[in-house]
Amino acid sequence: MNTPAQLSLPLYLPDDETFASFWPGDNSSLLAALQNVLRQEHSGYIYLWAREGAGRSHLLHAACAELSQRGDAVGYVPLDKRTWFVPEVLDGMEHLSLVCIDNIECIAGDELWEMAIFDLYNRILESGKTRLLITGDRPPRQLNLGLPDLASRLDWGQIYKLQPLSDEDKLQALQLRARLRGFELPEDVGRFLLKRLDREMRTLFMTLDQLDRASITAQRKLTIPFVKEILKL
């Protein structure tokens, strides 16, 4: 695990969730937009939505990693873990190079948090320098926010839906993750996993990591019989 150059919260980000490890599928235009915002020297805003497990957090982690490697100060705020901190943690974030707010749907109906996000958004607009990336599980207008002005602000910028991966893309994503971890996932084994397991990517990646560890321990290559043995299928 690694820590970006600056985090406003005591959190660690996964060092394997980068743009290089993200299989885009039908999301090439989204990736291009994200990287364009990160390259520019002035502020930019993107709202990204998708169901849980589609890769929203991966992309925010990747954005933080890219800018922190350049020495820029970044902030990552996972609102699904907001019980760990208070809204005042957002104070001063308009001075960072990048602010990533994850899972904004989690604060719907929470007056203090909605106002804190709204105020931060306005400060970032005034600063003109901070890049802002926000994710949710639905479009801004469908978030059931209690503060109409916040819903309006979130609807201003570029809005993208993270498209789900096809089965072929999921296979490619699994093989990419395997290569980055230093081993090969045979195509027949990958297709077997897609056929027999929950196809949610987080589950597939966790299973792949489990198989990697088992393969190292047993000093065996990944084959369908070995996978059946380890996963008790």
Swiss-Prot record:
Disruption phenotype: Essential, it cannot be deleted. Lethality is suppressed by deletion of the DARS (DnaA reactivating sequences) loci. Disruption in MG1655 confers cold-sensitivity with asynchronously replicating DNA, which is quickly suppressed. Increased levels of plasmid IncP-alpha RK2 in strain BL21-DE3, increased plasmid replication in vitro. Disulfide bonds: none annotated. Changing D167N: Grows at 30 degrees Celsius, impaired RIDA. Keywords: Cell inner membrane, Cell membrane, DNA replication, DNA replication inhibitor, Membrane, Nucleotide-binding. Changing R196Q: Grows at 30 degrees Celsius, impaired RIDA. GO terms for cellular component: cytosol; Hda-beta clamp complex; membrane; plasma membrane; replication inhibiting complex. Residues 6-11 are annotated as: Beta clamp binding motif. GO terms for molecular function: ADP binding; identical protein binding. Changing R56A: Severely impaired in ADP-binding but still has beta clamp-binding activity in vitro, defective in DnaA-ATP hydrolysis in vivo. It is found in: Cell inner membrane. Starts with a CTG codon. Mediates the interactions of DNA replication initiator protein DnaA with DNA polymerase subunit beta sliding clamp (dnaN). Stimulates hydrolysis of ATP-DnaA to ADP-DnaA, rendering DnaA inactive for reinitiation, a process called regulatory inhibition of DnaA or RIDA. ADP-binding activates Hda to hydrolyze DnaA-ATP; Hda monomers bind to ADP with about 200-fold greater affinity than for ATP. RIDA function can be genetically separated from viability, suggesting this protein has another function as well. Suppresses the toxic effect of overexpressing a TrfA N-terminal 163 residue fragment. Inhibits inner membrane-associated plasmid IncP-alpha RK2 replication probably by interacting with plasmid-encoded TrfA. HAMAP family: Hda. The active form seems to be an ADP-bound monomer; apo-Hda forms homo-multimers that do not hydrolzye DnaA-bound ATP. Forms the RIDA complex (regulatory inactivation of DnaA) of ATP-DnaA, ADP-Hda and the DNA-loaded beta sliding clamp (dnaN). Interacts with plasmid IncP-alpha RK2-encoded protein TrfA in strain B / BL21-DE3. This is DnaA regulatory inactivator Hda. The gene is hda.
